[in-house]
A protein has these predicted regions:
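Bacterial Sec-dependent N-terminal signal peptides
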Residues: 1-21
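Domain-level representation of secreted and single-pass membrane ectodomains enriched
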Residues: 16-148
Length: 148
C-alpha cells in the first residue's frame, strides 16, 4: 500500500494544469490538409531484444526518443478561421509505436492561447494547456497518448 501512496503523491505533484475547452478545429470548419511529421520506423522487436540484453540495473526504457525541430515557423499548417482566430496544426505519425509522448525544449504560450494534443479520431483530448503551463526553464512534457 505504501508504494501506491507514494506513486499517487508523486503523480499529483507533477500533474499538468489544464483549462476547460475544446480545440477550435472541432467547432469551426477547417481544412483536412495538415502537414504530417513522419517519425522514423520503430523496430519494436529490436528494442525488446536490447532491453532483454541490457546490463542489470539499467533503467527501464519507456520509449524511443527522436530529436526533431518542429516549430510554429518551420512546420505545421496555419489556418485563419472565419472569426479571424488563427490555428496551427501538425500531425505526428510513428508507425508501430504504442504511444506518443512529446517533450518540448522551448514551450511558451501567451495569455489567451490554448494548446491541445488529440488523436486522429478526436476521441482523446489532452488540454487545453495555457500560459499557466509555462515553466521557468521553458520545458514542457506532454503526457503519452496511446494509439491504435
Amino acid at each position: 500500500m505504501r508504494n501506491i501512496q507514494i506513486l499517487f503523491i508523486i503523480g499529483f505533484m507533477f500533474a499538468q494544469t489544464t483549462v476547460e475547452g475544446i480545440p477550435k478545429s472541432y467547432i469551426h470548419s477547417t481544412s483536412n490538409r495538415v502537414m504530417k511529421a513522419i517519425m522514423p520506423d520503430i523496430d519494436v522487436d529490436q528494442l525488446l531484444l536490447e532491453d532483454k540484453n541490457a546490463a542489470p540495473g539499467t533503467p527501464f526504457r519507456y520509449g524511443k526518443i527522436f530529436d526533431v525541430d518542429y516549430s510554429l515557423n518551420n512546420s505545421g499548417t496555419w489556418e485563419v478561421l472565419d472569426d479571424g482566430d488563427k490555428i496551427w496544426r501538425l500531425e505526428i505519425h510513428s508507425k508501430y509505436a504504442y504511444s506518443i509522448g512529446i517533450e518540448y525544449d522551448y514551450f511558451h504560450l501567451p495569455e489567451g492561447a490554448e494548446f491541445y494534443v488529440y488523436n486522429p479520431d478526436q476521441t482523446i483530448i489532452h488540454g487545453a494547456y495555457s500560459h499557466l503551463n509555462n515553466q521557468q526553464d521553458n520545458n514542457f512534457h506532454q503526457t503519452a497518448m496511446f494509439i491504435d
